[in-house]
Amino acid sequence: MATQVMGQSSGGGSLFNNSANMGMALTNDMYDLHELSKAELAAPQLIMLANVALTGEASGSCCDYLVGEERQMAELMPVGDNHFSESEGEGLEESADLKGLENMELGSLELSAVEPQPVFEASAAPEIYSANKDPAPETPVAEDKCRSSKAKPFRCKPCQYEAESEEQFVHHIRIHSAKKFFVEESAEKQAKAWESGSSPAEEGEFSKGPIRCDRCGYNTNRYDHYMAHLKHHLRAGENERIYKCIICTYTTVSEYHWRKHLRNHFPRKVYTCSKCNYFSDRKNNYVQHVRTHTGERPYKCELCPYSSSQKTHLTRHMRTHSGEKPFKCDQCNYVASNQHEVTRHARQVHNGPKPLNCPHCDYKTADRSNFKKHVELHVNPRQFNCPVCDYAASKKCNLQYHFKSKHPTCPSKTMDVSKVKLKKTKKREADLLNNAVSNEKMENEQTKTKGDVSGKKNEKPVKAVGKDASKEKKPGSSVSVVQVTTRTRKSAVAAETKAAEVKHTDGQTGNNPEKPCKAKKNKRKKDAEAHPSEEPVNEGPVTKKKKKSECKSKIGTNVPKGGGRAEERPGVKKQSASLKKGTKKTPPKTKTSKKGGKLAPKGMGQTEPSSGALAQVGVSPDPALIQAEVTGSGSSQTELPSPMDIAKSEPAQMEVSLTGPPPVEPAQMEPSPAKPPQVEAPTYPQPPQRGPAPPTGPAPPTGPAPPTEPAPPTGLAEMEPSPTEPSQKEPPPSMEPPCPEELPQAEPPPMEDCQKELPSPVEPAQIEVAQTAPTQVQEEPPPVSEPPRVKPTKRSSLRKDRAEKELSLLSEMARQEQVLMGVGLVPVRDSKLLKGNKSAQDPPAPPSPSPKGNSREETPKDQEMVSDGEGTIVFPLKKGGPEEAGESPAELAALKESARVSSSEQNSAMPEGGASHSKCQTGSSGLCDVDTEQKTDTVPMKDSAAEPVSPPTPTVDRDAGSPAVVASPPITLAENESQEIDEDEGIHSHDGSDLSDNMSEGSDDSGLHGARPTPPEATSKNGKAGLAGKVTEGEFVCIFCDRSFRKEKDYSKHLNRHLVNVYFLEEAAEEQEEQEEREEQE
């Protein structure tokens, strides 16, 4: 960066680098301008440069005039006269008391001479005028004013004159001549000076704007500048001295500012940019300018990523963080963080002067930038075209908003507004005046619009397919999202609303039969892309969808496979979205019930069952039959009678939950007896584990207590936690490792398998069976009609207000923690839960179906879902747990006691209790096996994981089965809850959600931490009792779902996801579904 500093000696040395004197001979004619009349001079434009110097006498030996050895200000005035008059000299003497302007960096302004430095911006080193050089021939002013299209190296800053050669530039400077700077003590004297020194025409030309000060003649087009100027008058009072620049219109009452202003015209040092024509006499300005080329932004905000090249910008930015608003409107109480806002306010509210008038309309403003933008709208209206539709915006911001609101599902490429092409338009005048130009413009626009329309057409079918068929690329189509939201909302409303949902989904599917087909086709295409052959692809998505939508898709799917797919997806999406929403809002159904009229817990569990599980109830009341169907074909699971059955089974489930297992529908009752035999089958492996179970005898009592704890929140992952808790309780030493194994392999797959089979055994039946079976498990696993101990958990209790639930949960958590601590289960739980969480995290993240399955499992959140190799049993323990937890600590204690008794009984009768629990784990493993058999082609990863897990799980699960049956719900809640939350959080990412969610239960930020005696366990509200062991002091608890996080980072991410869900539920659901579908395809 060549910076040229043109020094000038105070002693009057030459201004240029060489001491050689400029050859601008100054005779009595003064600058050889005697021939030019005053009118011919560029006096009005005499804004003598930032770069010019008046040079010495005729001898040229010195640049300074010394008269009487007194220094006086140089008087720059139009050169009509040959020399300065005595009166002018006297005027200069009056201002001599300013003591020279060397302090002002004007160098030495001698009598009748000013030493501004000529700056030749174009050249790195300005050429030196030789002493012998003759003045350039005088040329008419017209030539001086002419502008050449070529880049000219010599520019006069004040008047923007550009010269091609040095001679022209020197001549232009001489024409400017020396115009006097003078300072008057009063406005009257200045007025006289103006009258004597310049003509009215000149004054008019000097006029800078419509706003003029009556006291000193200051004028500007900036209202804020004018107001600031008036303050100077107020400060100075009546005896003010007005300092005025005659080269320009600058006027001030401050000597300091006046001297500072003079530097603009007579810079002592000039810093020139080597990359452009910029130059400045202020080093700070020059350095800031250089940063525009280098991109350096040294001033960074410590609170956000903002950075700036100027400190003033950073200072202004920091006000956005501090909220400081130092600028106040003079006419009202309006305050702002910067003066520009105040000026705008004054202009808009107080009707400040608006000198700029739009030639096309009545628009007026004082802001040039706004004026230009406004006029541009007349000339080029709506020049930003949407590449997707016919919409055209006048501003980029409007087009960007259009993208987000109208095309949220379009590829990100089209979202890049910076790449949006503008309409080809001519300049305003051409557009306004030339019809031909306008016609061409219209043609160009039409062609562009045609291209846009064609592009839109190409994209529209995709959109239609996406909307109708859940969009090929984005699994979460608008239609599926709508269905999801409607189902989730209806399910949240009530079981009746669930039936309405079923009808609605049926109506939707019936009304839009093509959409499912398209969705199927799109899904098949996606599957085909993911898999070489469509058959395996279909099988994979079908099986996965079976996992996800065996319960969900059955609601509205008449076709077992194709329709099942199309509807399974919407159903799965809806149900999964509902589960996600429910879980996000409140991992326990309790919270979801609050949202959806507190039927959501039921709806969460029942909504999915209603859509898929209830359908399954209608399809096959017997779990064995359902399992057989599942194993046989996922299409059988997607039978159309399911909607009717769902509508029926949902109320039945509601009744069952309220009345208990006894009112369970015959179909549900049948599955319960069928399940006991299933339990018996897995029971055989359990008896061998009974040995370990007795050692964990203390665990059983604790097992029931934990189930009650997690039960309220844990309807989501009952399947998986059940094995984890039993393993933690009964076989802590030997079972703990298997539990982790089972958790990673069996638990997540059981989640999927159970989810698959749970829908298959009919979730309503499972719910009722859960009520009956858990009662059997708690009281006596063999008798199906012993649910009284479990106390049929009324979902109405789940629907209790969240505050009451939290209070009851807190008391429960405290008691549970005490019980667990007394039993010593907390550490076991922690280790196993951690392992289970990891395992749950691993499977759910890669296979989206597992999260969906988890969400389906979530549907029976309130019920423990125990799955045997053939069928699944849903235990109302979770319901009872959450209900009791929500109801009262006494009930919780009673439930714990009953659970302990049942666990002891189960330990004594391992075949039964273990069978029931083993149903959860062995069922999960068996389900994994069955599902793996069904879905081996589609889900080899899950199947393999589930199958290897299944053999160890039956043994381990059965060992821990009796107490674990009761304890399983809480752990499952933790795991399933985490998985559900993962799905919810999976909206952003499926990976690591379990860890962050499970690791975070008991946050100080949640506000719930203080109320809980033991944050680790207490933080795991009912369903998080399993995770309670992990919770430690200082953790962060989510205020929405009470999930605890050990790391603030994870907690903040989780909280942000809740917020996103609150404001963008549909979009989030769509994204989640898309991710899940992608995973399925992969």
Swiss-Prot record:
Bias type Pro residues, positions: 684-713, 729-751
From its record, what is one biological process in GO terms?
positive regulation of neuron differentiation
The free-text tissue note of the record is: Expressed in the hippocampus, including quiescent neuronal progenitor (QNP) cells, transient-amplifying progenitor (TAP) cells, neuroblasts and mature neurons (at protein level). Expressed in embryonic stem cells (at protein level). Expressed in many non-neuronal tissues including the heart and liver. Abundantly expressed in osteoblastic lineage cells. Expressed in the spleen, kidney, blood cells, cortex, neocortex and in the utricle, saccule and organ of Corti of the inner ear. Isoform 2: Expressed in the cortex, neocortex and in the utricle, saccule and organ of Corti of the inner ear.
Interaction with RCOR1: region residues: 985-1063
Query: Looking at the record, which segments are called Interaction with SIN3B?
Result: 43-57
| Residue ranges of the region described as Interaction with SIN3A | 32-117
Q: Where is the composition biased (Basic and acidic residues)?
A: 440-475, 798-807, 854-864
Induction per UniProt is: Down-regulated in differentiating neurons and mature neurons.
Where is there biased composition of kind Low complexity?
A: 477-497
Q: Where is this region: Disordered?
A: 408-809, 831-1027
Q: Which Gene Ontology molecular function entries are recorded, alphabetically?
A: chromatin binding; DNA binding; DNA-binding transcription factor activity; DNA-binding transcription repressor activity, RNA polymerase II-specific; identical protein binding; RNA polymerase II cis-regulatory region sequence-specific DNA binding; RNA polymerase II core promoter sequence-specific DNA binding; RNA polymerase II-specific DNA-binding transcription factor binding
Effect of gene knockout: Embryonic lethality by embryonic day 11.5 dpc. At 9.25 dpc, disorganization of the head mesenchyme in the midbrain region with separation of myotomal cells from the dermomyotome and widespread apoptotic cell death. Forebrain malformation and widening of the mesencephalic flexure at 9.5 dpc and 10.5 dpc, and growth retardation by 10.5 dpc. Conditional knockout in the nervous system results in a progressive age-related neurodegenerative phenotype.
Provide ranges: composition bias, Basic residues: 581-597
UniProt KW keywords: Cytoplasm, Metal-binding, Nucleus, Phosphoprotein, Repeat, Repressor, Transcription, Transcription regulation, Ubl conjugation, Zinc, Zinc-finger
List every stretch annotated Interaction with ZFP90.
140-413
Q: Which Pfam families match?
A: zf-C2H2, zf-C2H2_REST
Q: Where is this region: Required for binding to the neuron-restrictive silencer element?
A: 196-207
What does the UniProt entry say about where the protein is found?
Nucleus; Cytoplasm
Provide the Gene Ontology terms for cellular component.
cytosol; nucleoplasm; nucleus; transcription repressor complex
Complex formation? Isoform 1 and isoform 2 form heterodimers. Isoform 2: Forms homodimers and homooligomers; binds to the neuron-restrictive silencer element (NRSE) as monomer. Interacts with SIN3A, SIN3B and RCOR1. Interacts with CDYL. Interacts with EHMT1 and EHMT2 only in the presence of CDYL. Part of a complex containing at least CDYL, REST, WIZ, SETB1, EHMT1 and EHMT2. Interacts (via zinc-finger DNA-binding domain) with ZFP90 (via N- and C-termini); the interaction inhibits REST repressor activity. Interacts (via C2H2-type zinc finger 5) with PRICKLE1. Interacts with FBXW11 and BTRC. Interacts with USP7.
- Describe the task this protein carries out: Transcriptional repressor which binds neuron-restrictive silencer element (NRSE) and represses neuronal gene transcription in non-neuronal cells. Restricts the expression of neuronal genes by associating with two distinct corepressors, SIN3A and RCOR1, which in turn recruit histone deacetylase to the promoters of REST-regulated genes. Mediates repression by recruiting the BHC complex at RE1/NRSE sites which acts by deacetylating and demethylating specific sites on histones, thereby acting as a chromatin modifier.
The domain comment in this protein's record states: The C2H2-type zinc finger 5 is required for nuclear localization.
Protein name, entry field: RE1-silencing transcription factor
**Taxonomic path:** Eukaryota, Metazoa, Chordata, Craniata, Vertebrata
